Amino acid sequence: MTDPKDTINIENVVASTGIGQELDLQSVAMDLEGADYDPEQFPGLVYRTQEPKSAALIFRSGKIVCTGAKSTDDVHESLEIVFDKLRELQIPVDDDPEITVQNIVTSADLGENLNLNAIAIGLGLENIEYEPEQFPGLVYRLDEPSVVALLFGSGKLVITGGKQPTDAEAAVDVIISRLSELGLLNGSF
């Protein structure tokens, strides 16, 4: 049986940074090839990088949010591209702006079907939201690590709120441990 931790896959990394000064987004949008800026639809300028694939949301305040990256390394690489593009436009950017990972979304697979009704009862209502008429997944809020896991009947998981990739591994360990204690997992992990 495959170890569920071996199935963990990073789906999205969101990080934030800033250049410490306000920007004229209209002007930046005209000079930055490939930039999308439609302030009636979204207050930020969107600049997409292809390699690595991500989107930088650049705001008038100078704050920048990078989303869509598949690793923390990709976030840093993507933002370095954005910083270089801004420098080319004569916009001063520090040599090494601080980049903060805000959220890592991962997927995993426990490798077996889950009885979500039994899990909801077994884990107790204080950390669980399960309304199958509204959403097919069970929402499990973990304290340590501080993440939210979505459990689906197929055994698939989505873990969100992590700040580092190891948070997903810790969450899978906690979930396997709790479900095993309750006798709700057949696998021997």
From Swiss-Prot:
This is TATA-box-binding protein 1. NCBIfam families: PRK00394.1-2, PRK00394.1-5, PRK00394.2-2. Belongs to the TBP family. General factor that plays a role in the activation of archaeal genes transcribed by RNA polymerase. Binds specifically to the TATA box promoter element which lies close to the position of transcription initiation. SUPFAM superfamilies: TATA-box binding protein-like. GO terms for molecular function: DNA binding; DNA-binding transcription factor activity. GO terms for biological process: DNA-templated transcription initiation. Keywords: DNA-binding, Repeat, Transcription, Transcription regulation. It holds the Pfam family TBP. Sequence repeats lie at residues 10-86, 101-179. PROSITE patterns: TFIID (PS00351). InterPro entries: TBP, TBP_archaea, TBP_CS, TBP_dom_sf.
